[in-house]
Amino acid sequence: MEESGQLSDFKLPEGIKDPSLEFDLIECLGRGSFGSVYKATYKKTGNIVAVKLVPINEDFQEILKEINIMKQCKSKYVVQYYGNYFKDETCWIIMEYCAFGSVSDMMNITNRVLNEEQIALVCYSTLKGLYYLHRNSKIHRDIKPGNILVSEEGECKLADFGVSGQLSERTRKRNTVIGTPFFLAPEVIQEVGYDNKADIWALGISAIEMAEFHPPYHDLHPMRVLFMIPTSTSPTLKEPHKWSPEFSDFIALCLAKEQSQRPSAKDLLKHSFFEKKLKGSYVMKSLSETAQMVIERCGGREEAVKAAAERKSKQSGVSVDFIHCESVDEPDSSDEEDLLERNNKRLSTQIQQKKEQQAQQQQQQAQQQQQQQQQQQQQYQPPSPNNNNRTTTKNNDINELDSLLNNMMMSSSASASTSPSPSSISSNGNKSGTTTNDYHTGNGRTSSSSPQFGLQHQNSSNSFPSSPNTVPSVESKPRQPASELDDLLEEMMNPSFGNRARNSSGGGGGLTPIGSPITKRPTPTMQSSTTTTTSSSSLPLPMSPSVYLSPTRVSGIWSGESAGGCANTTLWRKNPQYLLQITATTTIRITLRQTGDKLVHIGFYFARSNTGANDQFRRRITLTKEYLVPGLDITFLKSTEVSAKITMEPGYYVIIPATFEPNQEGSFELDVTATSDNIGGQYNSNNNIKLSEIKGDRDWRIISDRFEWRGSSAGGSFSGSSATWKDNPKFFFETTQTSNTTIVLGKLSDIPKETYIGFYIFKADKNCPFISLTANNLYSKTSFVNGIEVVHTQQQMPPGCYIIVPCTYDSRQEGSFTLTCYSDCQQGSIYKLDLSEQILTVHGEWRGATSGGCLNHTTWRNNAQYLIHNTSSSPTKVTIMLEQLEKMDNQQLPFVGFYVAKSPTPNLDKKLFSLTPKDIVGNTEFINDYQVHFTSIMEPNTSYIIIPSTFTPGIEYPFNLRVITNQHNVIQISRLPEWSTRKLSGEWRGQSCGGRYSNTSSSWTLNPRFRFNLPRGGRFTIILAQAEKPSYNGIGFYYFKTLQDGTLREFVCKSGFICGKEIVLESSINEGVTGVVIPSTFEPNIQDSFNLTIYSEFDLDFYNN
């Protein structure tokens, strides 16, 4: 099974006894569920290989399957297998070494998405590998960027055959659900049978991940993804205008919902996407070089991957625009061929020529630099010492410093002009106008790198670089400045110095980056508590030709709840917010200035106001890319003031001043100043702007508090593996008019980052709200995400009653959360529900003898029974719910239901052992769902008996039984006491088939006898059941008192004779009794088997006589 193409001729000898003596393990490349992979050197030849160390355990069969598949594969597009050896309890698998790891690792390490040329290379190589596998009747079943490895030459190869499958001629389709959830094809999830077209679907999803950094539905819980893939339309690129039509068409073909409509790997290799975009393996060079630099700075691949994972977790739930890799320059060639292998051969010659040219250029440059240094040494004349001329010496020093600084600035400016600016990376244009993007820090100014909102993370220490030619920053110990001059030189040389990320833990990750410069605070010259206008002389001198008019200024404070911090936390909405009205196109400068005693990191958000005539005067409660004004740098600086200049179109906007950390109290001033710039023939004027604080009297009606999922209230979700979600905290929300409502669920620091959260909104009955928590009443729901908050906006929400149920996805995930509701309905109300008076809940389980099954089985009497008593003097509506708590070991839920029977007396204190159709009020269906319920009207002073049951005996499961009513404290529920029980088996055979009692025959005395003693008397029930058969014999029994020698004395009781499955007799006795039970057939000589069961209120003796 070999493929033409150049393969490595490296081979290992057979019979290596101790692989640890033959291979040197250099570094760990990664760790997985089956083992670890190391970079290693084969000592005898020096060849670099990859060694996978796998423990020999119960999962080792899967590894043997992977080895078997790798042994059979001989293709340059599949990672080569060299051999495997055993040492102690570990298997050493020797494989081809791919220097740059997986495509996924390269993306995570560099924090970059791939460009189209790179995606084309990966997809083409993957299709070549799949064509080889599919031609040999193999399915990979786990195609994803994490299983596509990149060699040092930029070649891409398929790896990880742990879940691959072999297709035989007899089974051309498989039915096993296996693989990574986000990449599974619809037919794999639906288990309708699939073939190698499932790999094509996974390749389409992989292409989207390489373009957008995440696969579709990445922010949803994996179980939710398994539902979305078969039922939703095929995924597409989020921003198709950024990509070529050929790329979009390639993805559409790969993601055809019907597997029969997906092209084969062979057909896709001919797609026009590769004709236009496939260049050569050299296109991976920029990405691999950047990855290698990061790996070296981190101290190894494993550390680099850990740092990338930590950065990725901090970005979870935050919208980020990831940097694209550099575009690929078209090679100069008139005879360029269009296939990968031929391109690589042609380019190898070009690369060698370029290396020789670079070496010559470097040699020439070194010679020129040496000559220049010699000339400078000859020209330099040291000044003669003159102790009497101090002024001249000082002036000379200043002149030399000015010259040095000027040269540094010119050099830095020239360097900056040759590298692409951050604005060229992002596709987000400034829709509101022109932005200068400069920040004032104190009385000086540093020119900001001005990222668009989607790229704001590039300034944080755990984020991606601001330019495609730079390497992501790796946290290191900062160099200590030798003097204040060093600080000044560093700031002058680095135009973005004012926006560098701080190295402290406070600045990592999140929506908002944080800067590091600390500037000296000037003495505040003004204090104001109202909107004022000051003279332009109090403003810092502008560094542009624009002339600033008098500012519109407001003063405010961050105090208590209003010190909400930046948007990295859920508390930012509590900061002061200001409405800015602009009536004509105007160039403005927004300045935020600290006036308190303590200097902290500050910044502000500038966003469009809410839509709608009424809502635009209210606070902004969502800060996403679509609402923020593009072009403004929102880096937080430890500075006296921060400012930005921008040209804005007429409209309403919101400014939100904030400190970086919450609970940092202090005062501030916010200035909005119009410049005198000429725009469209008209000059700016302060009359064009109006600034005012958004006050509570015109704001949203806000209800907010902190709550917990704890103990039984950590019940999980409706979509998860538990029905206990109904025990979560619940909130009743009532609106009296159609309203716009936004609900924000935020998780606090005691909840792990990986925990998914979300909430449901149910339409509710105000009088009996709990019964509304069913799928039929579900009004809306959110996705479950593992970010810091979930925001849901419901436009035009009809008046009525609703219940909000916040959830973690899985049960028993404890922690604190906040729930905040913003509504423009001024007459509404929201409060936490306490339904303890309306809901009676008992916990039970079917376990051992108490898992007796339904009424089809005589053992139903072993089930627990519950008495519900209506103490009201009027009819009462009750809803009875039976809930299964959770799935066990990922198995399907059993079929369960319950019976509702009339109680013979209101205060019954014993279980029912006999039921007739007239006794049963009703029953539910038996279904394998989390909940079944039954609703009835109970008459005054009556009681029901509830019998929860599994459909078949022997099923053990926990459950909740709930009784819900719209009247408080009128229903009582209690479990009926269990009686002592014994069960024996017997048969009528030979002489023991004596028939019934008769005065004319004594044969009945030969029937089987069972000793039944009641030392204290009391109530008892005897049940005789015959074996299952198409038609039943007539059966019955007698209970006699006996003398000490066993002689029958007198009847205690006797049953009738019926031709049915069982006969039941309930009776009682006021004194202790010693006796026997004699089961009988109606006619003699009828052979059969039977069971005899006794239930007794008190202790009993029951055994074969």
Swiss-Prot record:
Its EC number is 2.7.11.1. Pfam families: Calpain_III (PF01067), Pkinase (PF00069). It comes from the Eukaryota. Its cofactor is Mn(2+). Signal peptide: none annotated. Residues 1076-1103 are annotated as: Domain III 4. The active site is at 142 (proton acceptor). GO terms for cellular component: cytoplasm; nucleus. ATP binds at residues 29-37, 52. Residues 438-458 have a biased composition (Polar residues). Residues 641-668 are annotated as: Domain III 1. Residues 791-830 are annotated as: Domain III 2. GO terms for biological process: aggregation involved in sorocarp development; cell motility; chemotaxis to cAMP; intracellular signal transduction; negative regulation of canonical Wnt signaling pathway; negative regulation of cell-substrate adhesion; negative regulation of protein localization to cell cortex; negative regulation of protein localization to plasma membrane. It is an enzyme of class 2 (transferase). Residues 23-274 form the Protein kinase domain. GO terms for molecular function: ATP binding; metal ion binding; protein serine kinase activity; protein serine/threonine kinase activity. Coiled coil: none annotated. PANTHER family: STERILE20-LIKE KINASE, ISOFORM B, STERILE20-LIKE KINASE, ISOFORM B-RELATED. In the N-terminal section; belongs to the protein kinase superfamily. STE Ser/Thr protein kinase family. STE20 subfamily. Probable serine/threonine-protein kinase. This is Serine/threonine-protein kinase 4 homolog B. It comes from Dictyostelium discoideum.
